[in-house]
Amino acid sequence: MPQLDKFTYFTQFFWSCLFLFTFYIPICNDGDGVLGISRILKLRNQLLSHRGKNILRKDPNSLEELLRKGFSTGVSYMYSSLFEVSQWCKAVDLLGKRKKITLISCFGEISSSRGMERNIFYLISKSSYSTSSNLGWGVTCRNDIMLIHVPHGQGSIVF
């Protein structure tokens, strides 16, 4: 603990300032330090502001296109994950049939997913968007159409 009396105050203050500023300057000016991060954040904010202005300057259908792209990305991700799960279920089911033990039964109706996707895209293209949430459930309403994603799969594990 430093002794701050009238004889040692100046020397302790001098050495502590010299020590702190000696390490503060290299840390902040190397590009990865505090000043580098602030430059990166300023550039990011400028890019985001220009990007937002460009989106709003386009025609009103651009928001429709953004929603459509987002929905198609989400649907493709969902179907790819369902495909991987169905492949895993088939592999485990074959393994279970060899050992005469059924490990997983009835994962869900995945085969009709592409037909559902076409119907959903058709209904979306003819309707307007409004979204509401109630107690954590996401419900998407499109005029007279209400879509709620419900997982169909039920798994049973037998030991």
Curated annotation (Swiss-Prot):
Q: Which leading EC class covers this enzyme?
A: translocase
Which Pfam families does the UniProt entry name for this protein?
YMF19 (PF02326), YMF19_C (PF06449)
Q: How does it sit in the membrane?
A: Single-pass membrane protein
Transmembrane segments annotated in the record for this chain: 13-37
Q: Which GO terms describe its biological process?
A: ATP biosynthetic process; proton transmembrane transport
Catalysed reactions listed for this entry = ATP + H2O + 4 H(+)(in) = ADP + phosphate + 5 H(+)(out)
Q: Does the keyword Ribosomal protein apply?
A: no
E.C. no: 7.1.2.2
> GO CC terms on record?
mitochondrial membrane; proton-transporting ATP synthase complex
Kindly list the places in or outside the cell where this protein is found, as annotated in its UniProt entry. Mitochondrion membrane
Which family is annotated?
Belongs to the ATPase protein YMF19 family.
Q: How does it assemble?
A: F-type ATPases have 2 components, CF(1) - the catalytic core - and CF(0) - the membrane proton channel. CF(1) has five subunits: alpha(3), beta(3), gamma(1), delta(1), epsilon(1). CF(0) has three main subunits: a, b and c.
Known role:
This is one of the chains of the nonenzymatic component (CF(0) subunit) of the mitochondrial ATPase complex.
Q: What is this protein called?
A: Putative ATP synthase protein YMF19
Organism, as annotated: Oenothera berteroana (Bertero's evening primrose)
Question: What gene is this protein a product of?
Answer: YMF19
